């Protein structure tokens, strides 16, 4: 790599991992593309983001080699990427009464609340969270990066977790992602084919 007039040019590189298994599954490939789009949005030129790069590589590896459930890898990437970029939600309890078992998550504020504590006049979308989902969110935000995939939820809760993390990330970034839309259309088609 060399610099010329303030521009850096890479003149040689070596591939460490091609993630070849991703090419065999269109859903995995579209999810990997979504991760790349998010990483591009969260990265700034001339500011290294090694933690985000490591998260991206670990999630690509999780998709390609570990065969983790897609909803789990997606949720891990979305929530941890948000945290690494300064959008860490407050997951310590209801922001009104302090209860450790709130059942709603506000996508705009990143705060938890109990159903009874909700202020009807306040705006924002609140999604229901179970104790298992809440514990998984806390784990993703605060665990050692090497243990990101070492939590377990049943498939319906993993799917709900994925919806919550997606809603939180896209709300915080105030944008949508074309690769995410494509991934969701593939999942919908896949689910329709399985139900027939």
Pin down the residues of each PLM region.
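Non-catalytic alpha-helical scaffolds and adjoining flexible linkers that form interface surfaces
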Residues: 1-196
């Amino acid at each position: 790599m060399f610099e010329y007039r303030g521009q850096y040019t890479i003149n040689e590189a070596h591939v460490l991992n091609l993630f070849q298994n991703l090419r065999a599954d269109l859903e995995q490939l579209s999810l990997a593309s979504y991760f790349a789009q998010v990483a591009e949005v969260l990265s700034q030129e001339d500011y290294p983001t090694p933690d985000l790069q490591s998260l991206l590589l670990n999630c690509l590896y999780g998709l390609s080699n570990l065969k983790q459930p897609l909803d789990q890898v997606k949720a891990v990437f979305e929530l941890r990427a948000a945290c690494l970029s300064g959008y860490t939600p407050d997951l310590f309890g209801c922001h009104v009464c302090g209860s450790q078992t709130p059942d709603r998550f506000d996508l705009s504020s990143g705060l938890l609340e109990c159903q009874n504590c909700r202020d009807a006049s306040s705006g924002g979308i609140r999604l229901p969270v179970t104790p298992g989902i809440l514990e998984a969110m806390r784990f993703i935000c605060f665990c050692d990066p090497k243990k990101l995939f070492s939590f377990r939820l049943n498939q319906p809760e993993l799917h709900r977790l994925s919806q919550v993390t997606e809603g939180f990330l896209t709300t915080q970034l105030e944008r949508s992602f074309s690769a995410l839309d494509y991934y969701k259309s593939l999942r919908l088609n896949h689910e329709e084919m399985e139900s027939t």
